[in-house]
């Protein structure tokens, strides 16, 4: 599942006229980079949640056949998205009962997504891909010790927006309810049911217009190299 329903407030005015997921870097929309990596990793079915200007995403991507994928859309109120956990819960009927890969549309990362397809959760409710903390999020999100993600004070790493998730993680959330994912992940960590790994490769959280411009410059430089 790709989470693509966000309003993108910090990227306005660009996101006044397009959804953040369609913002381009290196000549491609952010969500297209994600979809191409998912297809290359062997995924074939992808659910995308939509809210703000979501019709533009659906019009651009269609059924996904051009990317070798079968896309389904989970639609939310355009001006009242359900947040991360709410979006997952709302798409539960499309996702089914098996663990699934979860990816934020507004990140760029060279993590090998095929590793998520091969991973078993082993009783955990989620497995998080973490990264060293960027300057804009120096405090991090979770500790990582012996493959377990936790809530201790330090040292922490940043959640990349990439995970393997058991649908049971969002069982407390009813379809149509608004809910954040972070409290559910913290509860899973407290219960010893959150695993993780550290990715030291390329990862960018594209939360602002400045970071989008930086990623665009990086990708275009790589193309020229």
Predicted feature descriptions by range:
Residues 21, 70-72, 125, 193-195:
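Conserved beta-strand segments of alpha/beta enzyme cores
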Residues 7, 105-107:
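Active-site metal-binding loops of divalent metal-dependent hydrolases
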Residues 1-16, 39-41:
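N-terminal nucleotide-binding beta1-loop-alpha1 segment
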Residues 52, 127-141:
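Short beta-strand-to-loop element that shapes/binds the nucleotide-sugar donor at the catalytic cleft/hinge
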Residues 2, 24, 28-104, 113-115, ...:
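Conserved N-terminal catalytic core of the sugar/cofactor nucleotidyltransferase
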Residues 43, 100-101, 108, 112-121, ...:
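Catalytic-core segments of class I nucleotidyltransferases/pyrophosphorylases
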Residues 11, 57-61, 215:
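Hydrophobic packing residues within well-ordered alpha-helices of enzyme cores
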């Amino acid at each position: 599942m790709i989470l693509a329903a966000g309003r993108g407030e910090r990227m306005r005015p660009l996101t006044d006229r397009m959804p953040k997921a369609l913002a381009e870097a290196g000549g491609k929309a952010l969500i297209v980079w994600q979809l191409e990596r998912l297809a290359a990793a062997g995924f074939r079915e992808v659910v995308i949640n939509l809210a703000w200007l979501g019709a533009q995403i659906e019009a651009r991507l269609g059924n996904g056949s051009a990317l070798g994928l079968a896309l389904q859309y989970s639609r939310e109120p355009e001006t009242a998205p359900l947040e991360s956990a709410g979006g997952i819960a709302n798409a539960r009927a499309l996702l089914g009962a098996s663990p699934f890969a979860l990816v934020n549309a507004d990140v760029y990362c060279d993590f090998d997504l095929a590793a998520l397809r091969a991973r078993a959760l082993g009783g955990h409710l989620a497995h998080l891909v973490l990264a060293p903390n960027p300057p804009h999020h120096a405090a991090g999100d979770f500790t990582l010790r012996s493959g377990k993600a936790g809530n201790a004070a330090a040292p922490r790493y940043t959640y990349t927006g990439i995970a393997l998730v058991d649908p049971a993680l969002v069982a407390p959330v009813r379809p149509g309810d608004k809910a954040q994912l972070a409290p559910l992940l913290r509860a899973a960590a407290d219960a010893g049911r959150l695993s993780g790994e550290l990715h030291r490769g390329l990862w960018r959280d594209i939360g602002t217009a400045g970071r989008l411009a930086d990623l665009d410059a990086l990708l275009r430089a790589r193309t020229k190299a």
